[in-house]
Protein backbone atom coordinates (compact mmCIF):
# COMPACT_ATOMS: atom_id res chain seq x y z
CA UNK A 1 0.00 0.00 0.00
CA UNK A 2 2.84 2.37 0.88
CA UNK A 3 4.45 1.69 -2.51
CA UNK A 4 1.16 2.45 -4.30
CA UNK A 5 0.82 5.74 -2.38
CA UNK A 6 4.37 6.66 -3.35
CA UNK A 7 3.40 6.31 -7.03
CA UNK A 8 0.38 8.57 -6.46
CA UNK A 9 2.74 11.16 -4.94
CA UNK A 10 5.00 10.69 -7.96
CA UNK A 11 2.06 11.46 -10.27
CA UNK A 12 1.41 14.66 -8.31
CA UNK A 13 5.08 15.61 -8.54
CA UNK A 14 5.21 14.98 -12.29
CA UNK A 15 2.20 17.28 -12.83
CA UNK A 16 3.40 20.15 -10.65
CA UNK A 17 6.08 21.87 -12.83
CA UNK A 18 4.76 24.98 -14.56
CA UNK A 19 4.20 24.40 -18.27
CA UNK A 20 1.77 25.15 -21.10
CA UNK A 21 -0.84 22.70 -19.76
CA UNK A 22 -0.99 24.30 -16.30
CA UNK A 23 -1.06 27.81 -17.79
CA UNK A 24 -3.91 26.92 -20.16
CA UNK A 25 -5.84 25.08 -17.43
CA UNK A 26 -5.74 28.13 -15.16
CA UNK A 27 -7.00 30.25 -18.04
CA UNK A 28 -9.86 27.80 -18.68
CA UNK A 29 -10.87 27.87 -15.03
CA UNK A 30 -10.79 31.66 -14.81
CA UNK A 31 -12.84 32.14 -17.98
CA UNK A 32 -15.21 29.16 -17.88
CA UNK A 33 -15.26 27.69 -14.38
CA UNK A 34 -14.42 24.42 -12.65
CA UNK A 35 -15.83 21.89 -15.11
CA UNK A 36 -14.06 23.33 -18.14
CA UNK A 37 -10.76 23.48 -16.23
CA UNK A 38 -11.10 19.90 -15.02
CA UNK A 39 -12.20 18.51 -18.39
CA UNK A 40 -9.25 20.33 -19.99
CA UNK A 41 -7.02 18.58 -17.45
CA UNK A 42 -8.64 15.23 -18.27
CA UNK A 43 -7.81 15.80 -21.94
CA UNK A 44 -4.18 16.51 -21.07
CA UNK A 45 -4.10 13.47 -18.78
CA UNK A 46 -5.39 11.29 -21.63
CA UNK A 47 -2.41 12.37 -23.75
CA UNK A 48 -0.08 11.58 -20.83
CA UNK A 49 -1.67 8.15 -20.57
CA UNK A 50 -1.13 7.61 -24.29
CA UNK A 51 2.57 8.39 -23.96
CA UNK A 52 2.79 6.04 -20.97
CA UNK A 53 1.24 3.26 -23.07
CA UNK A 54 3.70 3.92 -25.90
CA UNK A 55 6.62 3.60 -23.49
CA UNK A 56 5.02 0.63 -21.71
CA UNK A 57 4.71 -1.29 -24.97
CA UNK A 58 8.23 -0.38 -26.09
CA UNK A 59 7.41 2.24 -28.73
CA UNK A 60 9.83 4.84 -27.36
CA UNK A 61 12.01 4.63 -30.50
CA UNK A 62 9.08 5.90 -32.56
CA UNK A 63 8.54 8.84 -30.21
CA UNK A 64 12.20 9.87 -30.39
CA UNK A 65 12.48 9.63 -34.19
CA UNK A 66 13.74 12.99 -35.61
CA UNK A 67 10.72 13.37 -37.92
CA UNK A 68 8.25 12.83 -35.07
CA UNK A 69 10.09 15.26 -32.77
CA UNK A 70 10.23 17.94 -35.48
CA UNK A 71 6.54 17.50 -36.27
CA UNK A 72 5.56 17.77 -32.60
CA UNK A 73 7.72 20.86 -31.99
CA UNK A 74 6.14 22.66 -34.96
CA UNK A 75 2.62 21.40 -34.25
CA UNK A 76 3.04 22.46 -30.62
CA UNK A 77 4.16 25.90 -31.83
CA UNK A 78 0.95 26.25 -33.86
CA UNK A 79 -1.36 25.02 -31.07
CA UNK A 80 0.22 27.09 -28.28
CA UNK A 81 0.63 30.27 -30.35
CA UNK A 82 -2.97 30.09 -31.56
CA UNK A 83 -4.25 29.43 -28.02
CA UNK A 84 -2.10 32.24 -26.59
CA UNK A 85 -3.31 34.77 -29.18
CA UNK A 86 -6.95 33.79 -28.61
CA UNK A 87 -6.44 34.12 -24.86
CA UNK A 88 -4.94 37.62 -25.17
CA UNK A 89 -7.70 38.69 -27.59
CA UNK A 90 -10.29 37.83 -24.93
CA UNK A 91 -8.59 39.78 -22.12
CA UNK A 92 -10.54 42.97 -22.86
CA UNK A 93 -13.90 41.20 -23.07
CA UNK A 94 -16.16 41.57 -20.00
CA UNK A 95 -16.05 38.56 -17.66
CA UNK A 96 -19.49 37.51 -16.46
CA UNK A 97 -18.77 34.56 -14.18
CA UNK A 98 -22.47 33.62 -13.99
CA UNK A 99 -23.10 33.56 -17.72
CA UNK A 100 -22.63 30.39 -19.78
CA UNK A 101 -22.87 32.34 -23.05
CA UNK A 102 -19.85 32.02 -25.30
CA UNK A 103 -18.35 29.06 -23.46
CA UNK A 104 -16.85 26.30 -25.61
CA UNK A 105 -18.36 22.82 -25.49
CA UNK A 106 -16.91 20.27 -23.09
CA UNK A 107 -15.81 18.20 -26.08
CA UNK A 108 -13.85 21.15 -27.49
CA UNK A 109 -12.31 21.83 -24.09
CA UNK A 110 -11.25 18.18 -23.74
CA UNK A 111 -9.76 18.20 -27.25
CA UNK A 112 -7.85 21.41 -26.47
CA UNK A 113 -6.22 19.85 -23.39
CA UNK A 114 -5.44 16.66 -25.29
CA UNK A 115 -3.80 18.50 -28.21
CA UNK A 116 -1.72 20.86 -26.06
CA UNK A 117 -0.34 17.96 -24.04
CA UNK A 118 0.06 15.61 -27.01
CA UNK A 119 1.95 18.21 -29.07
CA UNK A 120 4.40 18.93 -26.26
CA UNK A 121 7.72 17.18 -27.06
CA UNK A 122 8.87 17.98 -23.55
CA UNK A 123 6.18 15.55 -22.37
CA UNK A 124 7.81 12.81 -24.45
CA UNK A 125 11.26 13.51 -23.02
CA UNK A 126 9.74 13.78 -19.55
CA UNK A 127 7.88 10.46 -19.74
CA UNK A 128 10.79 8.69 -21.43
CA UNK A 129 13.19 9.89 -18.75
CA UNK A 130 10.99 9.45 -15.67
CA UNK A 131 8.45 6.75 -16.50
CA UNK A 132 10.87 4.80 -18.69
CA UNK A 133 13.43 4.53 -15.90
CA UNK A 134 10.74 3.72 -13.31
CA UNK A 135 9.34 1.03 -15.59
CA UNK A 136 12.75 -0.54 -16.07
CA UNK A 137 13.47 -0.53 -12.34
CA UNK A 138 10.03 -1.78 -11.29
CA UNK A 139 10.00 -4.55 -13.90
CA UNK A 140 13.00 -6.13 -12.18
CA UNK A 141 11.10 -6.65 -8.92
CA UNK A 142 7.40 -6.95 -9.86
CA UNK A 143 5.18 -8.78 -12.34
CA UNK A 144 3.08 -7.26 -15.13
CA UNK A 145 -0.09 -6.86 -13.03
CA UNK A 146 1.77 -4.93 -10.36
CA UNK A 147 3.34 -2.71 -13.02
CA UNK A 148 -0.15 -1.81 -14.25
CA UNK A 149 -1.34 -1.10 -10.71
CA UNK A 150 1.61 1.17 -9.95
CA UNK A 151 1.21 2.92 -13.31
CA UNK A 152 -2.43 3.58 -12.41
CA UNK A 153 -1.15 5.16 -9.18
CA UNK A 154 0.77 7.71 -11.28
CA UNK A 155 -2.41 8.48 -13.25
CA UNK A 156 -4.40 8.90 -10.01
CA UNK A 157 -1.79 11.42 -8.84
CA UNK A 158 -2.14 13.35 -12.11
CA UNK A 159 -5.94 13.25 -11.74
CA UNK A 160 -5.73 14.67 -8.20
CA UNK A 161 -3.45 17.47 -9.41
CA UNK A 162 -5.84 18.35 -12.25
CA UNK A 163 -8.74 18.43 -9.78
CA UNK A 164 -6.83 20.76 -7.43
CA UNK A 165 -5.83 23.03 -10.32
CA UNK A 166 -9.44 23.23 -11.49
CA UNK A 167 -10.64 24.13 -7.98
CA UNK A 168 -7.92 26.78 -7.61
CA UNK A 169 -8.66 28.40 -10.98
CA UNK A 170 -12.45 28.39 -10.45
CA UNK A 171 -11.95 29.86 -6.95
CA UNK A 172 -9.97 32.73 -8.49
CA UNK A 173 -12.87 33.21 -10.89
CA UNK A 174 -15.43 33.53 -8.10
CA UNK A 175 -13.45 35.52 -5.53
CA UNK A 176 -11.08 37.87 -7.34
CA UNK A 177 -11.85 41.27 -8.85
CA UNK A 178 -12.42 41.39 -12.62
CA UNK A 179 -9.27 43.48 -13.26
CA UNK A 180 -7.14 40.92 -11.45
CA UNK A 181 -8.81 38.09 -13.37
CA UNK A 182 -7.97 39.89 -16.62
CA UNK A 183 -4.37 40.22 -15.44
CA UNK A 184 -4.15 36.49 -14.68
CA UNK A 185 -5.68 35.70 -18.07
CA UNK A 186 -3.10 37.97 -19.72
CA UNK A 187 -0.25 36.24 -17.88
CA UNK A 188 -1.59 32.85 -18.99
CA UNK A 189 -1.81 34.07 -22.60
CA UNK A 190 1.74 35.45 -22.60
CA UNK A 191 3.01 32.22 -21.01
CA UNK A 192 1.40 30.19 -23.79
CA UNK A 193 3.00 32.43 -26.43
CA UNK A 194 6.42 32.11 -24.79
CA UNK A 195 6.12 28.32 -24.76
CA UNK A 196 4.84 28.43 -28.34
CA UNK A 197 7.80 30.48 -29.58
CA UNK A 198 10.18 28.18 -27.74
CA UNK A 199 8.59 25.18 -29.44
CA UNK A 200 8.85 26.93 -32.81
CA UNK A 201 12.53 27.69 -32.24
CA UNK A 202 13.22 24.08 -31.31
CA UNK A 203 11.26 22.84 -34.34
CA UNK A 204 13.21 25.04 -36.77
CA UNK A 205 16.46 24.08 -35.05
CA UNK A 206 15.57 20.38 -35.41
CA UNK A 207 14.53 20.91 -39.03
CA UNK A 208 17.73 22.69 -40.01
CA UNK A 209 20.00 20.54 -37.88
From Swiss-Prot:
Main location: membrane
Domain of life: Bacteria
Annotated GO MF terms: amino acid transmembrane transporter activity
GO cellular component labels: plasma membrane
Protein's membrane topology: Multi-pass membrane protein
Transmembrane segments: 1-21, 39-59, 62-82, 110-130, 147-167, 184-204
Record Pfam families: LysE (PF01810)
A GO BP entry: amino acid transport
Keywords attached to this entry: Cell membrane, Membrane, Transmembrane, Transmembrane helix
PANTHER family attached to this UniProt entry: AMINO ACID EFFLUX PROTEIN YCGF-RELATED, ARGININE EXPORTER PROTEIN ARGO
Family: Belongs to the Rht family.
Protein's UniProt name: Putative amino acid efflux protein YcgF
The organism's taxonomic lineage, starting at the top: Bacteria, Bacillati, Bacillota, Bacilli, Bacillales
Gene behind the chain: ycgF
